[in-house]
A protein has these predicted regions:
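Short, charged recognition helix plus adjacent turn
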Residues: 38, 67-80
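Short alpha-helical DNA-recognition segment
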Residues: 20-38
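A short, Lys/Arg-rich alpha-helix, primarily the initiator
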Residues: 1-21
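The alpha-helix within a helix-turn-helix
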Residues: 15, 26, 56
Length: 80
């Protein structure tokens, strides 16, 4: 798994936990829905920390809470 997939999985997980639709979290956080969908489909080469922070604000969690999962802990180095 790479970082883009881990970010997408985390967004989906948080939406399911909170019963929030993708469009709803986009609207709540002020991130354009197409940007969120690009992040979820791993089309975005760099999801961007600013957009992730906005989504965290919408979920009412910190960046630390967003990244504090076993998926992120298990990521391998992506520099080649």
């Amino acid at each position: 798994m790479n970082t883009k997939q881990a970010v997408a999985n985390r967004i989906i997980e948080l939406c399911k936990e909170r019963g929030i639709a993708i469009n709803a979290i986009a609207n709540i956080s002020g991130v354009p829905p197409m940007t969120v969908y690009s992040m979820l489909n791993a089309k975005s080469q760099n999801p961007g920390i600013v957009n992730i922070k906005k989504l965290c604000d919408g979920f009412e969690i910190t960046l630390g809470e967003f990244f504090s999962t076993s998926e992120f802990d298990a990521l391998e180095q992506e520099i080649e």
